[in-house]
Amino acid sequence: MGLSEEELKEGHRKRLRERYFRSDLKSFKDYEVLELLLIYAIPRIDVKPIAKQLLIRFGSLRRVLDAAPFELLGVPGMGPNSVGLFRLFKDIASRYLEEEVRSCDMLDDIEKVSDFLRMKIGGSKRELFVPLFLDMHNHLIAYDVYRGSVNQNNVTPREIVTQCLLCGASKLIIAHNHPSGVLEPSQTDIRFTRTLKMLLEALDIQLTDHLIVTGNLCHSIMPLIELYEKRPEYNSGL
């Protein structure tokens, strides 16, 4: 007598789990990663079609995990348990990267900082602004996440200076995301950075970097700021 359909599905789930424990995710395709997650949230059904549909709908594994709950619920087969698991998975990864950042020299290990920022704001469809407040040893004291951007006047240089003073920061890194994926800074980005840098210097606080963040990259605009400072003729239009 052959195996029932339910037994075949359970056998596939077991093999998928065993394969992961043998070789982690290196040999897994993106849909298999999602399938592995889904088997812990959705019992007794074949979740492979759901995993593949998620990739079709959102385009990549990262975009699936960055999707809002209501967007995920729009995919047939996705329910509160699976959406909650996806959110938990991403939040745990973000917490892990935050601990990595808190234990490092943030100016010497910019790769960890970039990983943290890409996880935190890189996939957001709305603009977010993040100041990272550092002590004199380049360790993270605190950070904040502001909704909106410098272009929308949601964040002001004076507000960030006040936060630096309140937490006793000696140095500051700022970052904001570009949901469009374009890394080029706007004129407002440049004006904001130069104003903030000037205000901080008067208080002996160093603005060490301003990063534009997308899902895949972090790009520093500080070399451009330094160019403006060295070449006054570049100031036209600011």
Which sequence ranges carry the predicted segments?
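Divalent-metal-activated hydrolytic enzyme cores
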Residues: N151, R194-L238
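Short HxH-centered metal-ligating active-site micro-motif
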Residues: S149-T188
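Long, charged amphipathic helices and adjacent flexible linkers at domain junctions
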Residues: L97-V113
